[in-house]
């Protein structure tokens, strides 16, 4: 059976891995997943990531903890295959009054809500992370 929403699966694997205090989680890789993970690394929500495998690429995400507690308090899928959520540059969401990030897929790639505001771009709201 094929996966209906690979991004939601990735976010769920990260959430479950952190709830179980895992060092890392593995998942199938794609360009979109890799760009979201790169963004989470730049924002300090994960330690690092690795892409491995010859024929089937696998993404390994190394989770981040601070004083034994997960750095990610909330990770939530917003736009999904059955209900796409798009916001223009004036209506981009602020997660937890700016303490978290909204991951936005724009015409210039995947970026945070802050970056999209600076660029003057809107797009599809993929997820919230705080």
From Swiss-Prot:
UniProt keywords, alphabetically: Ribonucleoprotein, Ribosomal protein, RNA-binding, rRNA-binding
A single GO BP: translation
One Pfam family in the UniProt entry: Ribosomal_S8
GO CC annotations, alphabetized: ribonucleoprotein complex; ribosome
Transmembrane feature ranges: none
Gene Ontology terms for molecular function: rRNA binding; structural constituent of ribosome
Organism domain of life: Bacteria
Its job: One of the primary rRNA binding proteins, it binds directly to 16S rRNA central domain where it helps coordinate assembly of the platform of the 30S subunit.
Family: Belongs to the universal ribosomal protein uS8 family.
Subunit structure: Part of the 30S ribosomal subunit. Contacts proteins S5 and S12.
Protein name: Small ribosomal subunit protein uS8
Gene coding for it: rpsH
């Amino acid at each position: 059976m094929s996966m209906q929403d690979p991004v939601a699966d990735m976010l769920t694997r990260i959430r479950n891995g952190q709830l179980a205090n895992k060092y890392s989680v593995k998942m199938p890789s794609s360009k979109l997943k890799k760009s979201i993970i790169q963004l989470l690394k730049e924002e300090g929500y994960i330690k690092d990531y690795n892409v491995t495998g010859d024929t089937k690429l696998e993404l390994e995400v190394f989770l981040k903890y601070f004083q034994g507690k997960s750095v990610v308090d909330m990770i939530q899928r917003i736009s999904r295959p059955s209900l796409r959520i798009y916001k223009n540059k004036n209506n981009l969401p602020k997660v937890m009054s700016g303490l978290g990030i909204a991951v936005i897929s724009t015409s210039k790639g995947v970026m945070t809500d802050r970056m999209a505001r600076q660029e003057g771009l809107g797009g599809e709201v993929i997820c919230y992370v705080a």
